[in-house]
Structures are given as structure tokens and as C-alpha cells.
Amino acid sequence: VNIIAVGVLPATRRNIVRSSNQTEDESSDRQAWNANYGLMRLKDFVDGFIIVDNQRISFQTNMEAMYLSYNDYIATCIADLVSGLFLERIDPRQYPELNPPVIDMNDIMTALSFDHKGRGKEPGFASIGRASAITCDLLNYILPLSKNKKIDTLMLARLAAKKQSISNINLNECEKNLALIRAPAKYLKKSEISINTKGIEEFMVKNSKLNECHLGVSLTKRNLVSLTTLFTFEKEQIPRLNEVINLARSYEDKSKNLANIES
């Protein structure tokens, strides 16, 4: 059984604005320790990690109010990757004229893990992101007369890169990645509105040190073209993970010192 773990990194707000509340800082360190402990314990049992970083919403005035929409965004990204066709009950056999590249769970697992010589298979740490664009004007829902829009897929790729789930991520450090385009059938046929899959593939390969990109195209019944991406890194290549690890070690050292004093 293949296992993908979704790991959540706590927001460490004192790196943005220094906290005047020592209890808040200690709570942040403790959350970092919990997150690091969970990730390291799971590392030997999972095939890959998708990292969700709460630092991404920590800049908001009311961070707690953002959790619901942030969770919905992450859930939509994951659902698009693993069950988009099933959720919309689309049978690709109904479109025999289309033969798009397909992504399955094997591709996702390959994109999320590393096979190191001498060390065997190890989980990677991935950031996930999604961008979408509507294919017609609002008026078209009432009077379906206007033409469908041509979608700037390169713009979608850049937007998805900006909406990654890990804060301060450097895509130039990415080892491998995956991209799934979902579009109505008419956008997969050769025409003036057909999507530019080549441009997306070039963008993704450019942001892969291994030149490894898993590209797939899937159908949707919605008037929407979406791009969902995974960028996979080694643990050491993610600054936020290293920051959480350092905070966890600091908390552990403080706890040991406090225990020694009390004893």
C-alpha cells in the first residue's frame, strides 16, 4: 500500500514580527517540536510528504479566520490530483478522439519519492499549488452564445508556482515535479483555443534539477481550466523545514535544561 502523508508546519510568527508574549513564542517552539517529531517518525513508513505551511497565512490580521479557506484550497489541490475524474463521474472512453497524457497514482508516487543508490527509496517533501481560469464570461451561463476564451496556460503555471503551500520556497532547488491540467474536452482538441501543454511542460522541466516532470491532462465538465502542481524537494532544500527543525531542537534543549534545574 502506498502512503502519502500531509504534514503541517506551524506558523512561527516571531520571524515576521517579534512577539512581546514569551508564552506565545514558547508555544510556537513546542508546535515546531511536535511537527518535527511527527515528520521524523513517519519518514520510515510513508512514500512521500505533501507539506502544508501555516506560515503562508500568518501574515493575515486574523489568521484563524483563514484556516477554513486554506484547508479548502489544499483539499481541492489533492482531490484534483487523485480523484478528479471520479468526483465528476467522467468516463474518458466517451471521448475516443482524445488521447491526452494521463497521470495515475504510480506517477504521483514516483514524483513524491526518491530512489537513492545505496540508501534505497526515501520520501520526498513536496509543495502543492493550484491555479485556475474560467473559460467563458458570466453572461455565457445565461446566453451560451459567446466564444470560449483562449487560456494563457503559462500564466497559470506561474500563478500556481506563486500559490505553493510552503512559504519562501525556491523552485530552482526542486528535484522533480508533477503537473496536472484539467480542462473541458473542447480545449483538448486542435483549435485556436487548445491549451498549450508544451509551454507548461517546459516551465516545469526548467524548475527541476533532475529534468523530471510528470505531466498529465484530464477532463472536466466545468467551464474551467486548472493546473495543479507538485514540486518535490529533499528535506535539506526547504528553508522552512530547517527553521522548524532548529526551533524544535531549541525547545528540546530548553526543556532539558529546565528539567535539570527542577531536579
Task: List each language-model region with its residue ranges.
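Tubulin/FtsZ superfamily GTPase core signature
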Residues: 1-263
